[in-house]
């Protein structure tokens, strides 16, 4: 009987301990965590969309309607990756670690594999930059990556996410015009 009572008490203590641990308050959100989570969310939709388009369709551009001068699918992907690098480098106050080819991506990235690698590497670099944005430096002036003037780290962190989603929306149309359901819509 004593063993049963001791066992019952041990189970109750463990259960209560687990309940208390499960109810522990979450750490408050920070500028860094919010930006990183947002960037991860965008990356989680953008990269699979880039991977979903077959390589032979990477040069696709809509042709019916008013689409003169719009980017091809590969140019969309390269542009977002290049801007990721430029913006992240601005946040880090350094030069991009790779040739970005300006805002259009490097001419050397031609195959789907090269372009997707350039894209994934740009997101890794963007996460590195976002990790440095905090309450202390988020609104400090930094040099704008787009010419003269200044901006803030926070605005550049927001731009990383917003810019990617802007082009993601265009890429979704390119995918659908080719009979491909975007990966994020398949779930």
Briefly describe each language-model feature range.
Residues 36, 40-47, 59-103, 143-187:
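Short, contiguous alpha-helical
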Residues 45, 49-50, 88, 125, ...:
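Well-ordered alpha-helical scaffold segments within catalytic/enzyme domains
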Residues 23-31:
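Cleaved targeting-peptide boundary
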Residues 107-144, 152-164:
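Acidic/histidine-rich alpha-helical segments that form the ligand environment
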Residues 8-19:
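Bacterial N-terminal signal peptides
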Residues 1-5:
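Positively charged n-region of N-terminal signal peptides that target proteins for export
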Residues 54-58, 92, 135-138:
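Short, flexible helix-adjacent loops and helix caps
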């Amino acid at each position: 009987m004593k063993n049963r009572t001791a066992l019952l008490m041990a189970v109750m203590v463990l259960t209560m301990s687990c309940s208390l641990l499960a109810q522990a308050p979450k750490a408050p959100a920070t500028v860094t965590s919010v930006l990183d989570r947002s960037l991860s969310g965008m990356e989680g939709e953008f990269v699979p969309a880039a991977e979903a388009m077959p390589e032979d369709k990477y040069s696709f551009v809509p042709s019916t309607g008013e689409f003169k001068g719009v980017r091809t699918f590969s140019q969309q992907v390269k542009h977002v990756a290049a801007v990721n690098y430029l913006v992240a480098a601005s946040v880090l106050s350094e030069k991009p670690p790779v040739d970005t080819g300006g805002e259009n991506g490097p001419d050397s990235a031609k195959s789907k594999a090269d372009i997707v690698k350039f894209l994934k590497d740009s997101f890794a670099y963007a996460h590195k930059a976002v990790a440095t944005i905090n309450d202390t430096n988020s609104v400090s002036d930094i040099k704008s990556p787009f010419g003269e003037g200044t901006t803030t780290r926070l605005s550049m962190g927001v731009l990383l996410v917003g810019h990617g989603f802007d082009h993601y929306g265009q890429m979704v149309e390119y995918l659908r015009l080719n009979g491909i359901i975007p990966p994020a819509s398949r779930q």
